[in-house]
């Protein structure tokens, strides 16, 4: 009975929670260069439990608690007006360095637009480690590349371990 009360009190007081956590979106369409990794300027917070996401200058998540974090980011790649999309990549960078990515490739049958979601688990030190969302859009004509704001987003939360 005493253990049940301790667990219940911890849950209701917030002592056990998947925080810090955040979810943010791209506030408006972002123009990007053709075939180049570009940071997504994620600037519209949906929520940010511990004020760890910078939505105004660096567009990065710097959690203030050490541990493992589940992070996810989606890039909506749009080549402009033509149906000549070659590929879209979505990747998460840690401390300014590329870690991993997901992609969709249309080289054999060009597309119009695509969303690519990437997820991963990251060890964070709780002080200086940070995560950022990057994307890469490539099209045959090489002009008009953009991240569409309707479906480009970034989020993360601490995993209870």
Positions of the model-derived regions?
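Extracellular jelly-roll beta-sandwich "head" domains, especially the C-terminal globular C1q domain
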Residues: 3-6, 14-161
């Amino acid at each position: 009975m005493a253990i049940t009360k301790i667990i219940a009190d911890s849950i209701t007081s917030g002592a056990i929670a998947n925080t810090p956590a955040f979810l943010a979106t791209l506030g408006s369409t972002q123009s990007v260069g053709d075939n180049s990794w570009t940071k997504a300027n994620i600037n519209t917070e949906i929520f940010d439990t511990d004020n760890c996401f910078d939505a105004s200058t660096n567009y990065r998540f710097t959690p203030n608690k050490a541990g493992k974090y589940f992070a996810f980011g989606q890039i909506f790649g749009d080549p402009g007006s033509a149906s000549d999309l070659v590929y879209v990549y979505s990747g998460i960078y840690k401390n300014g360095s590329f870690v991993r990515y997901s992609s969709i490739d249309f080289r054999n049958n060009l597309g119009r637009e695509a969303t690519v979601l990437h997820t991963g688990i990251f060890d964070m030190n709780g002080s200086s480690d940070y995560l950022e969302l990057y994307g890469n859009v490539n099209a045959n004509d090489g002009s008009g590349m953009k991240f569409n704001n309707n479906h480009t987003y970034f989020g993360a939360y601490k995993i209870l371990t």
